[in-house]
Amino acid sequence: MARESGTVLDNVRRIQPGDMSSFFCTGGTTGLPKIAMRSHGNEVANAWSAGRFFGDSIGPGKTTFCGLPLFHVNAAMVTGLLPFSRGAHVVLGTPQGYRGDGVVKRFWEIVEHHHINFFSGVPTLYASLLDIPADGHVIDSLEYGLCGAAPMPVGVFRAFQEKTGIRILEGYGLTEGTCVSSVNPPTGERRLGSIGLRIPFQAMKAVIVDDAGRYLRDCAANEEGLLVISGPNVFTGYLRADQNNALWLDLGDGKRWFNTGDLGRCDVDGYFWLTGRKKELIIRGGHNIDPAAIEEPLHRHPAVQLAAAIGRPDAHAGELPVAYVQLKPGMGATEHDLTAFMQQEIAERAALPKHVRIVEAIPLTGVGKIFKPELKRRETRDALRAALAQGGAPGASIDVTTDQSGGMSVSVELSEPGLEPAARVVLGRFPFAFSISIAAQPTRSS
């Protein structure tokens, strides 16, 4: 204590903007997580820019609820460094966040007790809160909630605002962009379904690229393209050097533009709209199907709590759309009911799911995002098993794995060597790397 000046800490360490501050795993919804390296400069810049955007909505006298787990950038930044840097209070909702025992069930009680003004969550949280009555709790301190990490179904968006009266600010960001890149303004016009306006000093645009991923031109207003970002918040790169290929686009302006892998458009007023993820597109016989074209209508069904659309491998069409559905507690619907509903709601015939699968629980990541790779692996195993049986190689044991790039590889174990020629013919019709082995034969005793 004696060596300190009395007004500031005399820290021997001098932190530079380029020094590494954190190593965060990416969300991992399209494959295995990668470790993103972010500098002190990245995080300070993002907190400052977001703070300027939110203004007095987050500041002295305000209380933020941190409900996402602390290993997630939203918790560390939006409900962490951002409110701390603005002089706001932060209430931690257990180290496990919303997954902590009783946190969601007692959410409205927590809001009332701590006079929460702001919270942040993923779409699955808002869907869960719709099933928790707020009756009897005084929650008028709550000004708005932020939604990011995954697109918010419009049906959930409307239902939550109508039921609670709480404004939702939908935003967009990535671990690679520190956290926040765009968000609907807290005091300006909020556009339903939009991911909002870019925050200060965040360069962001939609661009057209060729088949090799090279930049061709900027998109016109409302033209869909690949979203790219540049600015002081954009990370250094991934820890593993081999994962840094094709991260950056050269737009000819000397800036480092990060390829987000997301598809979107920017309207004439500067509001961005997320239209899908390039890697999640379902390609059925040449038709590019955005999973949202299936998921949005399903979320409008009164019995549906969560829905996820993926592509099922098909030797003829490439992929066939399949919908997974998790029903609301106490609600009932059959696959036939949901199929009939979608026939009325989905105009694009190619987008109608070939199958609807009602499951007890859709797999989620640690922060509550729908984890589609698990569903994709499940469909791939089922499709290949059926194709092998039809092609003369029944009873195969199939293991599907996902590599760092999100690609799949298949290991097939056959019951006898004579099935291998037929199996190779069948597997050769699918765009997967595969290996074939023969199950060990039991030793016969004489």
Feature map (PLM): residue ranges:
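Conserved adenylate-forming
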Residues: 5-18, 23-68
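Short hydrophobic/charged patches on amphipathic alpha-helices used for structural packing
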Residues: 12, 104-108, 136, 295
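Glycine-centered tight turns that cap/initiate beta-strands
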Residues: 19, 141, 165, 201, ...
